Amino acid sequence: FEDGKKVRFFKSNKETIK
């Protein structure tokens, strides 16, 4: 289960977009 990894990647992507 790579939920934490996915969430971490999503958060990083969101920061990059911001």
Curated annotation (Swiss-Prot):
**Which terms are listed as keywords in the entry?**
Ribonucleoprotein, Ribosomal protein, RNA-binding, rRNA-binding
Q: Which GO terms describe its molecular function?
A: rRNA binding
Please tell me whether the keyword rRNA-binding is annotated for this protein.
Answer: yes
Role of this protein: One of two assembly initiator proteins, it binds directly to the 5'-end of the 23S rRNA, where it nucleates assembly of the 50S subunit. One of the proteins that surrounds the polypeptide exit tunnel on the outside of the subunit.
What would be the name of the gene that encodes this protein?
Answer: rplX
Disulfide bonding pattern of the chain: none
Origin: domain of life: Bacteria
The UniProt entry's sequence similarity note says:
Belongs to the universal ribosomal protein uL24 family.
Q: Which organism is it from?
A: Proteus vulgaris
Q: What is this protein called?
A: Large ribosomal subunit protein uL24
Cellular component per GO? ribonucleoprotein complex; ribosome
**UniProt KW Ribosomal protein keyword:** yes
Q: Report quaternary structure and partners.
A: Part of the 50S ribosomal subunit.
